[in-house]
Amino acid sequence: MLQGIEAHGDVALTPQLFAEFQLDYVRGTLKAVNEPLPRIPPLRTGVGLRWQRNALQAGGHVRFVATQDRIFSTETKTEDYRLLRLFASYSFGDSNMTHTITGRLDNATNELYRNHLSLIKDLAPEAGRNFRLLYNVRF
């Protein structure tokens, strides 16, 4: 049996400043033996701020991931962690096509963490601090 909740919201603090939040949680149980289902993610929450003025955006987001210790018999516990993402973007184009260039710094604090859903979490942690330059076209 699976039970869960997911929520996401944005709030305009000013015409140019927005706060966002997200939360998701799943609980899975194999009812026949009353044991936790495998590969169920832990509770995850996040908060962020985004500034936007015309074609420019910048902001940050912190994601909090709880310890996962409600585990299937063959799994190992995964410790909690926090991730900081910073970004800035610029958009241009017209009503037919919009181009967006984004610079994004993921795991800005270089946190050592393991994703509970990773099949190799016991062998290798997730990526440390990394930068991405993204180009997106919408048409």
Model-derived segments and their meaning:
Residues 1-68, 109-112:
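Gram-negative outer-membrane beta-barrel transporters
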Residues 7-11, 47-51, 60, 86-90, ...:
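Residues on the lipid-exposed face of transmembrane beta-strands in outer-membrane beta-barrel proteins
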Residues 71-78, 85-89, 99:
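Short, glycine/charged-rich beta-strand-loop motifs at protein surfaces that mediate ligand recognition
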Residues 19, 90-139:
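C-terminal beta-signal and adjacent terminal beta-strands/loops
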Residues 1, 39-42, 78-82, 125-127:
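Short sequence motifs at beta-strands and strand-loop junctions characteristic
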Residues 8, 32-38, 73-77, 120-124:
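Outer-membrane beta-barrel domain signature
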Residues 10, 14, 28, 73, ...:
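A generic signature of intrinsically disordered, low-complexity regions enriched in glycine/proline
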